[in-house]
UniProtKB/Swiss-Prot annotation:
It comes from the Eukaryota. Its main location: other. This is Glutamate rich 3. The keyword Cytoplasm applies. Residues 169-185, 1476-1487 have a biased composition (Polar residues). Residues 416-426, 443-452, 478-487, 534-557, 619-638, 677-693, 769-802, 1115-1130, 1264-1307, 1319-1329, 1342-1357, 1402-1412, 1550-1568, 1589-1599, 1614-1637 have a biased composition (Basic and acidic residues). Residues 145-192, 408-453, 478-814, 1111-1194, 1238-1445, 1457-1637 are annotated as: Disordered. Component of the primary cilium that controls cilium formation and length. May function within retrograde intraflagellar transport (IFT)-associated pathways to remove signaling proteins from primary cilia. Also involved in neuronal vesicle biogenesis and neurotransmitter vesicular function. It is found in: Cell projection, Cilium; Cytoplasm. Keywords: Cell projection, Cytoplasm. InterPro entries: DUF4590, ERICH3. Transmembrane segments: none annotated. Residues 579-590, 608-617 have a biased composition (Low complexity). It comes from Mus musculus.
Amino acid sequence: MSHSHPAGLLATYNSLTDKHLAGYFNNTRIRRHLLRSGLITRSGRILSEKEYKVNNMKQDHQKYIRECLARAIFHKVLDMERYHQLEIKRKLDTLARKERIQRLKGEHTRRFIEDNMPVLTPHPPAGPKTNRGHSVLAEEGRSSPLTLTAPRPYTAPGNMQPPVRLQPLLSSRQTRNGSKITSGSKPKGSLLESEALFPLGGKKAMMKFRNYMDHSQKEDLYQLPHINSYHTPVPPTPQPQAGKNFRDKRLESWRRKRLRPITAPNGLEPLFAKDPGRIYKTAPHSNAVITMVYFGKNVHLSYDDIDFRDEIKIYQQHCGGENLCVYKGKLLEKDTFQFISKRHHGFPFSLTFFLNGIQVNRISSCCEFKHRRSTRLGGKRGYFGFVCVEKASPCYRCIIAMGLDRKPSSTKPKKEKITEKKEEPPNKSQGKLRKDRMNAPSKRNEMERKESCVSAAFSAEEIKLGVKEVRTAIEEMEWKGKSGRDVWEEDQDNAVKYDYEEDFEVDDEKQDEKVDEDEDQADDQMSGGSKTPTESEKDNRNPEKKIETSSEKAHDSENEDTGCSDSEEDDRQDVKTMSSISSRSHPYSSESEDDSTEVGGEADSVSEEGSSRSSSSQDLRENDDPGKPHFPIEKYLETEIEEQEITEGHNGPWLTELSGMHVTEGKPTMGIQALSESEHKEPRRVASSEVRAKSQLQKEAGLPGVEEEVGQITGGAQEPGHCCSNTAPGLSPTDDGVTPMRKPEVNLGRGTEERAAISANEQPEQDAQEMHTLKEEAMKKDESSQPEDTDAHAGVREESGMQKDGTCHPQDAGIDVELRERVDMQEDGTCHPQGADMDVGLKERVGVQEDGTHYPQDADMDVGLRERVGMQEDGTHHSQDADMDVELKERVGMQEDGTCHPQDANMDVELKERVGMQEDGTCHPQDADMDVELEERTGMQEDGTHHPQGADVDLGLRERAGMQEDGTCYPQNANMDVGLREKAGISEVLLGERSPTGVLLASAEQSTEKGECYLNIASEAEAGTEGSSRHGEEQLIPTGKVAAEGSVFLSVEQARDRQKDEDLDRQALLQTQMEKERAVSEAGQELKAEFTDSGGLNSETLEEAAVLKEVGTSEVKEAEREVGSPKTDGDQGEEEALTELEVVGPVEDTGPERKAGSEETVLGGERAATERKDFLEEAPISASTGEVQASPREVFRGNHELCKEDTAREGVIADTESTAEQDLRAVFPGELAAAGGIEKVERLTPPLRETGSEREEETGPEVLKTEDLLGEQKVKGEEEGTAKEVGSEEEDRASRPEMEAHAKDVEPTGATELGEATKLLEDPPKERAITLSEATPQFGKSPKESEATATEHKGGEELPGQESKALWPQGRGLSHDGEGLLGAPGPEADKAQGPEGFFTARCEEWAAKELDSSAGSERLEEDQPLQAQREDIQRMTQGNLSGERLTRAVVVCGEAKAENPQGEGSEDKECPPGTVTGSLTGQNWNMGGNIVEAEEDPHGGGIEEPTAEQKEEESAESKSADGIPEASSAANAQKETWDGAGEALGEAAAEERTGTEDMAPRTEKVAVVEEVTSAGAMVETEQEQAPEAQDREGGETKASRHTGTAGEDTGSTGKDEEHQSGAAEEFRESVSQRETA
């Protein structure tokens, strides 16, 4: 086929005509394909394009036509079907209408007849005539049966009609029409009843009823119905008919199941039960009685149903087509039910099971006989199972499978012999019985060898069925009053006549030959054995049959002598049956090894007799006639019974008495005495002496065979005249008058008698031991019990000793052997039932009470609980103690009254550990139910209750709050972190009051009442400080929400008072620290710079929080300023510090670690570490204990040197910790940086600034700002010159004095702290606070949120320290709050420049972890572009921070990315998230002015530094914010701050590359980055370290400038703050632009 191509040869090319492809297309397969495709014809001609298209069109048309035809046919069929349905409906309507008409006509005619026939037909008057001329009674009598609605005869019991005037009518008509009454109405009524039970239904049933009523009316016209309203009419028995008679007998046959063997054919009745004059035919149905069990459902869904029974229906397909319901009923689980199978012969046995109308199982098998074994249908989860199948005959398939069709020739002689033996006269049988018993031991020895083979022949199922048959036969023998012989002979005759008489003897018959061979070998081995196996079998069988014959007479004589009633006889036989079952439960215990083969001597015969006892059941089984195949044990049982009776008859009344006593569990000693009195013969005496000697020796030796030999010797000594049966051994008196009794069975009573007989003088203990030994030996030897001892189960009798009085208590007999061993019997010799039922292990652990009874509660108590919980003095356990959780009990002491309050028990363990119990020993439910996080954030009120809003306080807040003076632990104090508690001890000085949790909460509460959200933030700061583990949780919390949650409403005046009191102490501390700081001013300043860089994270976060606060709550800030102005600087410093700490919350969780040395970590380099140590000495004074505690986490931010320095700090902090926790916060450079950020936040919240605590915090944040400004100015200095930096420093100095003045206005303490902070940070706290306030309004962040942010920043510093512990490799770049997410200083990590480089690498790793990506650390690497890192930071920020912060973080990252590639290089790449974050963090503290300066144009290559004018504006704005927050200036400052943050990113990267020496510049940049990041995440705060590396690179000139005079720093700070406000605005604008982009 040609294909269209552009032009040339390709346009006309046809592959089919290409000669080069001729060979290809000549391929048969290809040609077939082309032919199918229609490209060539059958002849091979290639079709043209036109022909091909025509052919395709034709094919498509044909396909379309076919589809149309199919559619038409389909619709036609639908129309036809619809029409057909309409026709059917119309016909049905017609039929129904006709039927309705006919019914109406019939009813009309019948009414007419009923009304007129009585009038037309003459009959005696039945009563007063009505106007219509018929009897009222007659009308009433016939009205009910003629109604169509009652398909029951009018004689039914429901028709209660009073006999009105019946006597005269009945008297006259009974004589004349009595026969009609009997044959007419009653039979038909009964017929109707039987038919109504299974109505055919519908029209046919109604017509049948109608016809019947018509006929009955005609026949009963001349008589009234025979009505008796008080009796149910019973129709007379119909005339016997052949069919009916057979049916009745067949139905009764299964009820007489005990009279017939199980394998009897179902269709045939025993001959004696049938009438020989009639010919019977086999029933078509199997009529097998099937017993099943309903196991129940696995899942029960309907619990509201009162009736828990399930409806069961079983249908049987009895003849191949029709289903018949053979069972229907409601059953509970484990219920058994019976039904009769109606399977027709030749059809399979098929059942369908329905459970509540749902088919659940089906079975189909050849016949019922196949299911004779107990099986569960459907596996483990089946609903039904077979219990037994009776009257089931095997089908041909089963007969062939079981081999029943092959009958050995030996079976018939056996049957004949059995019948002959039974027919022998009793005298001969008795004579032979004696001889056979003498020879029985040798024969039984032979049979013992055969038992193994014979036992295999009998399956467990056959044994069970055999036991059933035995029981049935014995019961029938008693019930029918027939002799055992007659019953057995009838059974034998029936068995001979049945074709499947050997259902259970198949294996036995197959092994007959093997048994004969074994017998021959046994005879050869026996010394005295000369008989052939057949003779021995005959000998064994003859005595058995004779025993049966004589047993009948003996049985009668026994009844006469003992006067036993039939009921007693039944009881005995039942007991014997049980004993036989028990003996069969231990089939064929081999004892031939213990038996001797000698037969000559009497003593030897006795030993053989012992073995014969054990093998009696075996012999009987082996010798069971094939005629009774399914009675393997029945003969044995019967033989035992007969032998017992014969023995009793020959021995006289004494033997009968003995056996009766044993059967009834009488005293065995009485029987022994009777025997000893009745028998006094020489041989027995000799035997008794021998027995006694041997038994004495064996007893002394402790041999188990004592009992056996005793029995053997006794048997040998007995005279032949003494009838010794195989199972009932004779008894001979010994010389001392004691009759040693042989233990023929595993009978405890017999064993006891033997022991008593052997040694009457021995102690009961020895007897008991010997008895136990004899019991074990008897169990091994003989599992069958003697007839007279059959009442006691063999095992039970052995294990339960008889009492001194010779009686065995039933409860003792039922006691488990192991239990008996462990549980001693009481003194009275009886075992208490409760002791018997008690678990052995429990009894071992739980002592029996003095009264010998166990308390149920002790028995039920868990052992472990008993061990842990001591019993009360009264010896009883309290249920509540027993139920108490062990772990809870360990932690919760019991009350004085010894009881545990439920509410205490239910209290969470962790909560109980943190929250002390009230003085009354009870825990308030609200405390127990309070969310852990809620409790951590909210301190308890003075009344000891929690305010819901305070319940959300972070757990970390609870950890840092100390106990109150009253000794009770407020939940927030109780939850104080252990490390914090250790580092910040509870001091009597105002530590608890001034603690962030205590005083700051109070001040926060007060300010919150007045609308000061910053106090709320302070609460959060506490929460954050204590619960820094909740990463960024507070950051994520909306400002308003945080304020609401963290705020504790207190009046401003109260907060003021508290803070003033605390500020006094803090002022003293601050003064002391300031002096220390002066000593190490420059070193401290450098350390401050570095520490500020480390703390710059916090400052950034704080500034970021401040920005957010200002944006969210500009108005609130004004109110807070107003409210906060009254507060002392120290108070607000505390509160703001707390606020910062709270905002830094997670960071301050590291606070304790900072105290330990986290501040050292803040310092980037060794030099920084050293300086920072000095600074730490100063810092602890200004910083609050909480800050100090928070500082330990900062320690980990930096390198190990920082940690060391932190250790030094810890020493200093320890000193200052008790006095001023918040002061320490303000003092620490890192914390001061954080505090600076916080103060910026506080600027956002003017009240904080106004208060003394605000001054402190402002001092810290402003110091950070100063450092940031210095850093930025240093950056400018690098770019523009150091002169500009000097100017900025001067501005910082100027601003710092202003702040100091403001602090002094607020409170002298605040001024002192400001002075210290100014020295440390060289940044006026006032201006810094203004910067914070300005930055905050821009972001619209509520004061609380801003404080939370500031706290987060602070935490950024501190937390990095904390995290640096856990995440030391990650560095401080990441905080628990998620600040570290954005801040993972990559460049420093890659550079590994000093401690800061190392710290930066750690921060990068932490950032990677925070980002949950393996690339996190790589982002921190130099290779990764800043953009990727920025994206990571964004993700981290988004995960942990609010939208504003995320946005800022993104912007910062973006700017950092832009800046880093331009100005920084690979280090900038490293900087991305971590460095940028770090720089942002460090610079955020200084964002007010330094950010603007450090901020690079995101799009520009160089770092944009805010002009001096901008700085001145920023300073002015900060000052104005310090006095009155200006939203515009704050916005501008924030924008500038953001711009500065972007620049700071670039600068931070550049500086980090340049070196890590300049900690201040790095801190500044970090502050810028932090503030930007703080908007994004406080995680960036931790990455301050990366910026620190940049700051170091930026030059130590910045650090030197930063560490310059305080005046220069202050002046630079003022400028920086001005620039920061402008830069914040610019930065925010750039952020907004980027967001819009």
